[in-house]
Amino acid sequence: VHLTGEEKSAVTTLWGKVNVEEVGGEALGRLLVVYPWTQRFFESFGDLSSPDAVMGNPKVKAHGKKVLGAFSDGLAHLDNLKGTFAQLSELHCNKLHVDPENFRLLGNVLVCVLAHHFGKEFTPQVQAAYQKVVAGVANALAHKYH
């Protein structure tokens, strides 16, 4: 991902304020509610029968935290996203058979959640930088599919 110094600063400054557990759970939960076909990858998570069940599900929250932990690792290695996400790409491609389009959807949901949590602080410039990052991460996660 090519980010200007200003964009990198905007991304890392905001990320330093992110509650990974809260934002991760909300982002994954929203993905499962807004795009219900993604729930098929999480059948072992128990009750996903309603939006309230999804958003309150402890396994969704825990996995969301794990997902954002990996995203944090990516932010520390923006110049080598493919390398950083190589193992996760292989896992999601070969073992889990996740449609790579879901990575793009989750990235966009994450941007929405960040905007919701940070309001005016999530300026159009910050959003533009995050859109580049989530697109880069989605591309890196889809790498083993090509």
From Swiss-Prot:
Does the entry feature the keyword Secreted, yes or no?
no
| Residue span(s) of domain Globin | 2-146
What is this protein for, i.e. what is its function?
Answer: Involved in oxygen transport from the lung to the various peripheral tissues.
Q: Which GO terms describe its molecular function?
A: haptoglobin binding; heme binding; hemoglobin alpha binding; metal ion binding; organic acid binding; oxygen binding; oxygen carrier activity; peroxidase activity
The entry assigns this protein to a family as follows: Belongs to the globin family.
Looking up Gene3D superfamilies in the UniProt record yields:
Globins (1.10.490.10)
Q: Name one GO cellular component term.
A: haptoglobin-hemoglobin complex
* Modification type Phosphothreonine: residues: T12
Using the record's annotations, give every residue carrying the modification S-nitrosocysteine.
Answer: C93
Q: How does it assemble?
A: Heterotetramer of two alpha chains and two beta chains.
> According to the UniProt entry, which residues carry Phosphoserine?
S44
Tell me the residue numbers annotated for binding heme b: H63, H92
> What's the protein name?
Hemoglobin subunit beta
Q: Which organism is it from?
A: Leontocebus fuscicollis (Brown-mantled tamarin)
Against Pfam families, the record matches this protein to: Globin
The UniProt keyword set, sorted, is: Acetylation, Heme, Iron, Metal-binding, Oxygen transport, Phosphoprotein, S-nitrosylation, Transport
Q: Which residues carry this modification: N6-acetyllysine?
A: K59, K82, K144
Xref: PANTHER family: HEMOGLOBIN FAMILY MEMBER (PTHR11442), HEMOGLOBIN SUBUNIT BETA (PTHR11442:SF42)
Q: Which CDD domains match?
A: Hb-beta-like
Give a yes or no for keyword Ubl conjugation in this entry: no
Query: Which InterPro entries is this protein grouped with?
Result: Globin (IPR000971), Globin-like_sf (IPR009050), Globin/Proto (IPR012292), Hemoglobin_b (IPR002337), Hemoglobin_oxygen_transport (IPR050056)
What is the annotated tissue distribution of the protein whose record heads this document?
Red blood cells.
Q: Name the SUPFAM superfamilies on file.
A: Globin-like (SSF46458)
Where is the PTM N-acetylvaline found along the chain? V1
